[in-house]
Regions:
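Hydrophobic, lipid-facing positions within transmembrane beta-strands of outer-membrane proteins
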Residues: 58, 121-123, 137, 143-150, ...
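Surface-exposed extracellular loop regions of Gram-negative outer-membrane beta-barrel proteins
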Residues: 83, 89, 221-226, 269, ...
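Outer-membrane beta-barrel translocator domains and adjoining extracellular loop/strand segments
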Residues: 176-182, 212, 218-226, 263, ...
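Face-selective signature of the C-terminal outer-membrane beta-barrel domain
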Residues: 196-214, 236-382, 398
Length: 447
């Protein structure tokens, strides 16, 4: 037998997303030059994707959209914060929280998003974690370019039907930066885990977690720092950031279909502080405490054989909360004055989605039509889900074994960020944020 070479294209069209969907394997994550095994950097090489030309940033711009227009999912659960030292209200950051060694597959959509994914205008990343080893314990110690970590893969029941896979990582950048006499000393920690239990041949229950604790301190031990370092020490605040997502999912398979139910809690706490002359004995010039969190629940059913049609439909809902306390010492020509602001609110949200698809002409032509509706109780402009209808149509025709003609037309909506909804305009007399704030929308045409 001669040599056999098996290869697969990363671009695999599906009925839901016949265009602009790329599957990323763990091997590609490991081998992408300069990515340092960071999934956020790997996708920057995809067609239509640009990165922010700033060192050590993971902000991704897709098809001309903003860095806050990307959405991330892990085993069907939304991940609002994907990166360390994340920008609140955006999706960028310093390095990805996700450990690629725990992933089974990644689907990256730059268009033609499936209807079950909400709030994405530019891209959606759908990640699936692998289950743990059902036979024996396996541990791995990893020394990376910027961190050290421990991976664990083990059964946690005697019959091997319940497993655990997880990791913990901690950076050593603060030691390296101190040796290099840089003015800031960042430290990040993250954890990730999945507990998976096979209840029966048709039923599966899983629990996932993803979180981080990041802090940035000023390097005040430098003697006679250079002018550029003095400048950075003069304006840069110290900060702490905590984020986490905990979620659970239930999968039930039946003849011709599947049911998935998920519930999750996510949270982000962002604190910044600055003292006059970096001396804690002197008054503060900046003190920000900003927090946001969500409870989410979603149920979706997929039916694969309805007289030749395929149907996917689901509903979801939840609550979200935001709190911000800000103090700034503002210096003007007339002197200094204190600027204080406080904002907090709670919203409810709800969603519905459905898609119907079918193949024609002996599976040469695939057609899909879908609809999604979202709403939240923030204001009259956002509460009616019929204002945020997101229809979509896609088709794909197989011309030959190697050629396929595909197209997609869709409209997508995204709710404003909490930082935008929470801005109270205390410096603008008569300002009312709720009067004009609404969902963002985009019409997308891809062929």
């Amino acid at each position: 037998v001669g040599e056999v070479v098996v290869s697969a294209s990363p671009f695999r069209p599906t009925t839901e997303s016949p265009v602009s969907m790329r599957r990323i394997g763990t091997e590609e994550i490991d081998l992408t030059p300069g990515a340092n095994r960071d999934i956020s950097k790997v996708v920057q090489s995809a067609p239509g994707v640009l990165s922010v030309p700033t060192a050590n940033r993971n902000d991704v711009l897709v098809r001309g959209g903003g860095a806050n227009e990307n959405r991330y999912y892990l085993d069907g659960i939304e991940i609002p914060v994907l990166n360390h030292f994340a920008v609140q209200g955006g999706s960028g950051g310093n390095a990805s929280l996700v450990n690629p060694e725990l992933l089974k597959s990644v689907n990256f959509y730059t268009g033609a998003f499936p209807a079950q994914f909400s709030n994405g205008l530019s891209s959606v990343m759908d990640m699936q974690m692998r289950s743990g080893n059902p036979d024996r314990f396996h541990g791995k110690l990893i020394l990376g370019a910027s961190d050290v970590g421990l991976n664990v893969d083990t059964p946690i029941s005697s019959n091997g039907k319940t497993t655990l896979t997880g990791s913990f990582r901690r950076s050593y950048l603060q030691m390296l930066f101190k040796v290099l006499k840089l003015p800031f000393l960042p430290t990040y920690n993250d954890y990730q885990f999945k507990v998976n239990s096979k209840l029966s041949d048709r039923d599966e229950l899983y629990v996932i977690g993803l979180g981080s604790f990041d802090k940035n301190r000023l390097n005040l031990s430098m003697k006679d720092p250079e002018e550029d370092r003095k400048y950075i020490l003069g304006y840069l605040p110290e900060n702490n950031q905590i984020s986490y997502v905990f979620g659970a999912g239930y999968l039930h398979s039946f003849t011709g279909g599947r049911l998935q139910v998920t519930a999750s809690r996510d949270y982000l706490k962002n604190q910044l502080c600055k003292y006059e002359n970096n001396d804690e004995a002197l008054p503060k010039t900046l003190d920000i405490d900003s927090r946001e969190g969500n409870y989410r629940v979603r149920a979706a059913v997929s039916l694969w054989d309805l007289n030749g049609f395929r149907l996917q439909a689901g509903v979801g809902g939840g609550t979200g909360s935001y709190r911000n306390e800000t103090f700034r010492q503002v210096y003007t020509a007339e002197g200094s004055q204190e600027d204080r602001s406080s904002s907090r609110f709670t919203v409810g949200r709800y969603e519905f989605f459905a898609t119907l698809s079918r193949d024609f002409f002996r599976e040469r032509l695939s057609v899909l039509a879908g609809l999604r509706a979202d709403g939240m109780t923030y204001s009259d402009l956002t509460s009616n889900p019929f204002r945020q209808l997101s229809p979509r149509v896609s088709l794909s025709y197989k011309l030959s074994r190697k050629w396929r003609l595909s197209a997609s037309v869709a409209r997508y909506h995204q709710e404003p960020s909490y930082t935008t909804m929470g801005y109270n305009g205390n410096l603008i007399p008569g300002y009312n944020q709720k009067e004009g704030l609404r969902y963002m929308a985009v019409n997308q045409y891809i062929a």
